[in-house]
Amino acid sequence: MKPSVVRRSDARPRPDLHAVSDAIVLRDVRRAYDGRDVVCGVSLEIRAGEIFGLLGPNAAGKTTLLSIISTRIRPTEGDAWVHGKHVVHDVNAARRLLNVAPQEEALYPTLTAEENLAFFAELYGVRRSERARRVQEALDTVGLASRKGDRVATYSGGMRRRLNLGCALVSAPRVVLLDEPTVAVDPQSRAHIFDAVRKLRAGGTTIVYTTHYLEEAEDLCDRIAIMDEGRVVACGTLAELLPLARATEVIRLRLLHPPDTLAPLEAAEGVEKVEAVGNEIRLFTTRAQLALPRVYRTIAQLGQTVLQTRVTPVTLDDVFLELTGKELRD
């Protein structure tokens, strides 16, 4: 891979030949604001027709990366292509291939859902003869067909988020970028959004889905890139990422008092790693059944009392902790 350089505006770099069939290709993408990098040399290949998750805490660089892919901002360095179209040098061609459902809603509350969708269909250049069909398809996809004649001012927050997604669909994009689509929505609307995303994937649409909810990434995404401080620290399927935690199970203990030392627990047979926050202890292991009796004996020798014990499979939060030294939920 060649290092990224700042190119002249008339240069037209191309992705590697093997990557042209991918929906999105990023090569050494960097974005800086006021001399500070918020996206730091990201390289990714996102396959056509997959749900690709960008998982990370707030300020990880997810939204900025999405803005580069969508052509809303230019990278400081590096290159990005959407189905072979460069997001800087072929910007209009790239824009025709994708659409974005941003966190910020751009809806007209005095119009009905149907009228909002029709407006965006016209804005995106959908032929008049196709608009009614596109509007109805979007309503069906996001589960709002029965409320299409109601003014948006009467919608709940979750329904508005679903309509916001629908507005991105009327142009029939090959790539849809979803930026934290379920933040502060009700469970019913979240389920509708999940259904819509799965329908789009079934129809061959590529989805890039940013979230800081690890459960969403685990349940919904085909592959996941974990981001922290502008960098991709790991990328793969859930099955590929979970082993990075160096364990298969986590013993979660709540003690009566915070421990004075973790060294005896770290030395217990079967324990790979120990993390503590206050009186909450997490012990990473591949053999919880073997490790637990030894852990209990060690805790008793320390004069501690166990108030609660849970054994759970490792999660992406545990992977994030292993890779970055902090919790995704922090």
Regions found by a protein language model. Name each.
Residues 78-89, 93-94:
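Conserved ABC transporter NBD signature motif
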Residues 99, 118, 122, 129-147:
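Conserved ABC ATPase "signature" region
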Residues 194-286:
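ABC transporter nucleotide-binding domain
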Residues 176-179:
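Catalytic Walker B motif of ABC-type/P-loop ATPase nucleotide-binding domains
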Residues 70:
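Helix-to-loop junction immediately C-terminal to a conserved catalytic motif
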